[in-house]
Curated annotation (Swiss-Prot):
Residues annotated as transmembrane: none
GO cellular component annotations of the record: cytoplasm; EMC complex; Golgi apparatus
Domain called MPN: residue spans: 4-147
Organism this protein belongs to: Rattus norvegicus
UniProt keywords, alphabetically: Endoplasmic reticulum, Membrane
Domain of life: Eukaryota
Family membership noted in the UniProt record: Belongs to the EMC8/EMC9 family.
Membrane topology field: Peripheral membrane protein
PANTHER family: ER MEMBRANE PROTEIN COMPLEX, ER MEMBRANE PROTEIN COMPLEX SUBUNIT 8
Record-given protein name: ER membrane protein complex subunit 8
Length: 207
């Protein structure tokens, strides 16, 4: 599997989703730019999947529900319109010391892998969460022989960790998580935009 990297925008929105609902499990999707298919990837070419954005899905009860199907269909359509592809899934469990993927996480990630072979499953480690974002809070899993296995936990999975750390801390300090919209919020009020353009602007402004 190629390497995995997250842009600052994708990382920050994952962090903000967990911060908005600190006592709940949360989940979401990660999208990458759609690439033209290549017949061959030269060995050692340093190919990697870059997650350019994060789409927060649900908070509270995470299950394989009809609403998840609605979300996947709507977000897949949005991705096609913007030359993106759903390429990953993230989840933060309810319990602070539980950072292992459960059945829901593995099933949704496997569903994504059917359409994107290099899909990644990212688990957010709540035990590492601090307001100053001193260390990355994620564990990256890859699918190998139909099982999800954790990649090197010491690897830097952010495209620019110093930038991601600084901006995440700034957004937490300004309580930007209060304005974050997930798909649950959108279902409550369809005027709520799950692409979170205001947070995207805030990240860009702080870069």
């Amino acid at each position: 599997m190629p390497g995995v990297k997250l842009t600052t925008q994708a990382y920050c929105k994952m962090v903000l989703h967990g911060a908005k609902y600190p006592h709940c499990a949360v989940n979401g999707l990660l999208v990458a730019e759609r690439q033209r298919p290549r017949k061959e990837h030269p060995p050692g070419a340093g190919n990697h999947t870059l997650f350019v954005d994060c789409i927060p899905l649900f908070h509270g009860t995470l299950a394989l529900t009809p609403m998840l199907e609605v979300a996947l269909t709507l977000i897949d359509s949005w991705c096609k319109d913007n030359s993106y592809v759903i390429a990953g899934y993230y989840q933060a469990n309810e319990r602070v010391k539980d950072a292992s993927p459960n059945q829901v996480a593995e099933k949704v990630a496997s569903r994504i892998a059917e359409g994107f072979s290099d899909a990644a499953l990212i688990m957010v480690d709540n035990a590492k969460f601090t307001m100053d974002c001193a260390a990355p809070t994620i564990h990256v899993y890859e699918q190998h022989e139909n099982r999800w296995r954790c990649r090197d936990p010491h690897h830097d999975y952010c495209e620019d960790w110093p930038e991601a750390q600084r901006i995440s801390a700034s957004l937490l300090d300004s309580r930007s998580y209060e304005t974050l919209v997930d798909f649950d919020n959108h279902l409550d009020d369809i005027r709520s935009d799950w692409t979170n353009p205001e947070i995207n602007k805030a990240v860009l402004h702080l870069c």
